[in-house]
Amino acid sequence: MSKVYVFDHPLIQHKLTYIRDKNTGTKEFRELVDEVATLMAFEITRDMPVEEIEIETPVTIAKTKVLSGKKLAIVPILRAGIGMVDGVLKLIPAAKVGHIGLYRDPETLKPVEYYAKLPADVEERDFIIVDPMLATGGSAVEAIHSLKKRGAKNIKFMCLIAAPEGVKAIQEEHSDVDIYIAALDEKLNDHGYIVPGLGDAGDRLFGTK
């Protein structure tokens, strides 16, 4: 069973309050999502491997640690996931960025992939899928499928707000994928929106309706 990590850091929760607020404008909403993504990236990379090297400081020779060269890629689910990418790249600027686009089939209501652009060395990379919302989990499950069928072996999913239904969907379909969230909300309403949620993340990020 995949693990669920809820980040209750005071800064994350403070910023999340204003992300939820319907009176927060597009510019501030975008900035807050970016900032929370950076804070979450700090936590999600806690287990990155390091190795010891020797350097010369202005005072002496010293042994210290650096990242051991693990390849990492960030994959936003279009379009709202784009709003979280730069926040992660601030901490991991060398990470590659892929993209996965999905639409909902009007008859089956299931997500269908319409776009996928990923680094060439998929099998060698660890992946972090980012999307502000985890509602029904359909898009997340399909995005993970998309990476796995191309050879990805180590995948994490990161979002701002999740509904229990979405968490359950990932755990049932991809028990090897851990989930990192800023808040686990109450439920989905009859329209599939997370309650209390934050509305439509894509519209609020890009100023559309």
Curated annotation (Swiss-Prot):
5-phospho-alpha-D-ribose 1-diphosphate binds at residues 79, 104, 131-139, 200. It catalyses: UMP + diphosphate = 5-phospho-alpha-D-ribose 1-diphosphate + uracil. InterPro entries: PRibTrfase_dom, PRTase-like, Upp_B, UPRTase/APRTase, Ura_phspho_trans. Pathway: Pyrimidine metabolism; UMP biosynthesis via salvage pathway; UMP from uracil: step 1/1. Uracil binds at residues 194, 199-201. Pfam families: UPRTase. Its EC number is 2.4.2.9. GO terms for biological process: UMP salvage; uracil salvage. CDD domains: PRTases_typeI. Binds 1 Mg(2+) ion per subunit. The magnesium is bound as Mg-PRPP. Allosterically activated by GTP. The keyword Signal does not apply. Its cofactor is Mg(2+). It comes from the Bacteria. GO terms for molecular function: GTP binding; magnesium ion binding; uracil phosphoribosyltransferase activity. Keywords: Allosteric enzyme, Glycosyltransferase, GTP-binding, Magnesium, Nucleotide-binding, Transferase. Catalyzes the conversion of uracil and 5-phospho-alpha-D-ribose 1-diphosphate (PRPP) to UMP and diphosphate. Belongs to the UPRTase family. This is Uracil phosphoribosyltransferase. It comes from Lysinibacillus sphaericus (strain C3-41). The gene is upp.
